[in-house]
């Protein structure tokens, strides 16, 4: 007679009931207004400088009347697949005899088997539905159900990561590595051709070999994709990606004038230049550090422009002043100051100063701004 641990059986049954009870409901009842932002992973074996396969789509929002019907439909279809996966896991576990001490390992192995044969057929809303169910488990204070669903989610992400190009896998690993020294060691191993790497938690993993320039470009592409949105749903991920890009570029050894880091800008972004001109006018110190920190956290000049999130590209600038109090050069409303673009602007200005051999107090000031910004982002990221 098969023996199924009560706790796991209860968790699976609870998760299934939570899914099946929601799938048949109207969309407005199925979806809670507080749907969390959910990571989407789409891995394409493509050369660098393409849309990066790691992103966090914006939340559906708090107003059900404004939800995108396509996303609602994707959530429903994803929920059906989650229910199917959990049902198959429950069936397999009922046929097994497990010792209590091996429950967690058994769940992981079963999840690997069930998801491994389904990962290529998963709907785009699968991870979205998983995140919604994890949120429901948190709301119900059901830690066992939450842990089970998180195992399923992590297994899906692991399978998708393996299908990514090497430099994409490395970006994901770097975003999960908290210690700066560990990230540098990981980059050195990757540049040397890959091998076994021991992470912050003491676990060993096999890492692929990849080009540092590809890694920096991939992180930069993702930053560009995230920062081009009216709102930033995940500033922690954004901060991690900025750090990954800057550390990969720094390890390449080309310096500020390295042509490999050139995005091809003909002009610098207006919002970032306006903010930088304010910083240069003040002495380095705690007050200046607070200004930078506020903007990096999405306050002051870095605040998301929620009111005009849906405004067209021709929205005019009413009262915004340009550099040194002059009117805006373009006449268009600039985006908020974004961390990745801000550091890019600082680097370009510094590069111009060094190229013209005019380094002095301004260059030292900008170097301080660059290092202080990286320190603040490190604190935000982990």
From Swiss-Prot:
Q: Which GO terms describe its biological process?
A: regulation of DNA-templated transcription
Give a GO cellular-component term: chloroplast nucleoid
Its localization reads:
Plastid, Chloroplast stroma, Chloroplast nucleoid
Q: Where is the transit peptide?
A: 1-44
| Keywords in alphabetical order | Chloroplast, Plastid, Transit peptide
Q: Does the keyword Transit peptide apply?
A: yes
Q: Return the InterPro entries for the record.
A: PRDA1
State the protein's purpose.
Answer: Plays an essential role in early steps of chloroplast development. May be involved in the redox control of plastid gene expression by maintening the redox state around chloroplast nucleoids. May positively regulate plastid-encoded RNA polymerase (PEP) activity.
Alphabetical list of PANTHER family matching this protein:
PROTEIN PEP-RELATED DEVELOPMENT ARRESTED 1, CHLOROPLASTIC
Descriptive protein name: Protein PEP-RELATED DEVELOPMENT ARRESTED 1 homolog, chloroplastic
């Amino acid at each position: 007679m098969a023996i199924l641990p009560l706790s796991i059986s209860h968790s699976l049954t609870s998760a299934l009931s939570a899914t099946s009870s929601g799938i048949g409901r109207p969309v407005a009842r199925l979806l809670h207004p507080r749907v969390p932002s959910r990571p989407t992973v789409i891995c394409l074996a493509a050369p660098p400088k393409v849309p990066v396969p790691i992103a966090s789509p914006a939340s559906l929002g708090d107003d059900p009347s404004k939800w995108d019907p396509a996303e609602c439909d994707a959530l429903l279809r994803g929920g059906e697949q989650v229910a199917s996966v959990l049902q198959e896991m429950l069936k397999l576990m009922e046929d097994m005899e497990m010792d209590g001490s091996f429950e967690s390992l058994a769940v992981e192995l079963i999840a690997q088997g069930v998801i491994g044969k389904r990962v290529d057929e998963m709907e785009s809303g699968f991870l979205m539905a998983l995140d919604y169910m994890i949120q429901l488990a948190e709301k119900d204070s059901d830690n066992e159900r939450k842990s089970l669903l998180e195992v399923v989610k992590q297994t899906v992400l692991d399978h998708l990561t393996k299908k990514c190009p090497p430099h994409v896998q490395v970006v994901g690993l770097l975003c999960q590595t908290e210690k700066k020294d560990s990230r540098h060691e990981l980059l050195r191993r990757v540049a040397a051709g890959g091998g076994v790497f021991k992470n912050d938690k003491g676990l060993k993993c096999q890492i692929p070999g990849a080009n540092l320039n590809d890694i920096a470009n991939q992180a930069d592409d993702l930053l560009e994709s995230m920062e081009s949105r009216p709102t930033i749903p995940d500033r922690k991920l954004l901060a991690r990606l900025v750090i990954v890009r800057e550390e990969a570029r720094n390890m390449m050894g080309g310096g500020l004038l390295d042509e490999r880091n050139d995005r091809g800008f003909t002009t610098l972004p207006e919002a970032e230049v306006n903010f930088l001109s304010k910083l240069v006018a003040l002495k380095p110190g705690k007050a200046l550090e607070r200004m930078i920190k506020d903007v990096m956290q999405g306050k002051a000049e870095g605040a998301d422009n929620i009111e005009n999130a849906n405004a067209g590209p021709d929205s005019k600038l009413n009262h915004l002043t340009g550099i040194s109090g002059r009117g805006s050069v373009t006449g268009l409303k600039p985006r908020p100051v974004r961390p990745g673009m801000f550091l890019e602007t600082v680097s370009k200005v510094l590069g111009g100063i060094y190229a013209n051999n005019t380094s002095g107090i301004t260059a030292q000031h900008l170097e301080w701004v660059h290092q202080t910004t990286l320190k603040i982002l490190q604190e935000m990221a982990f």
